[in-house]
Amino acid sequence: MAKDVQVMLRQAVPGLGKPGEVVSVRPGYARNYLFPRQMAVRLTPGLLKEQQMRREQEAARKLAEKQQAENYKKALETIGRFVIRKKVGEKDLLFGQVTASDIAEVVLATSGLDIDRRNVLLDEEIKKTGVYLVQVKLHPEVTATLRIQVTPE
């Protein structure tokens, strides 16, 4: 019986794996199906080293991104309050409401940090003046809590 060969997948193969994974397959399957369709390459020591190096670089990049997000979190939380001025009617009710875009704009104006409005997590609608706590997702593992003060214009 033929011995299985080790290949690295270049693209997703149903039932086999994702790109970059090392899998064992029968030689005929590799030679007749995977190699001609450029779906996989034969695993060599050089390719293995290259893949290991890529993984290390990716891990270092992710760690640097998380560290940067932690630094942004500290900077945002030391600012204290972000003030948003809105037109107010009776009983301190706003005309409209404070949106995630408003919060992203005031953070940019105050701290210089450009955050995406989709990363601003509003637990409740802000329709009155006052102080509110708002979560901002800076990284999948890092969330900052901002104090937003809504005041009349």
Curated annotation (Swiss-Prot):
GO terms for molecular function: rRNA binding; structural constituent of ribosome. It comes from the Bacteria. This is Large ribosomal subunit protein bL9. SUPFAM superfamilies: L9 N-domain-like, Ribosomal protein L9 C-domain. InterPro entries: Ribosomal_bL9, Ribosomal_bL9/RNase_H1_N, Ribosomal_bL9_bac/chp, Ribosomal_bL9_C, Ribosomal_bL9_C_sf, Ribosomal_bL9_N, Ribosomal_bL9_N_sf. It comes from Synechococcus sp. (strain JA-3-3Ab) (Cyanobacteria bacterium Yellowstone A-Prime). Binds to the 23S rRNA. Transmembrane segments: none annotated. Keywords: Ribonucleoprotein, Ribosomal protein, RNA-binding, rRNA-binding. GO terms for cellular component: ribonucleoprotein complex; ribosome. Belongs to the bacterial ribosomal protein bL9 family. GO terms for biological process: translation. It holds the Pfam family Ribosomal_L9_C.
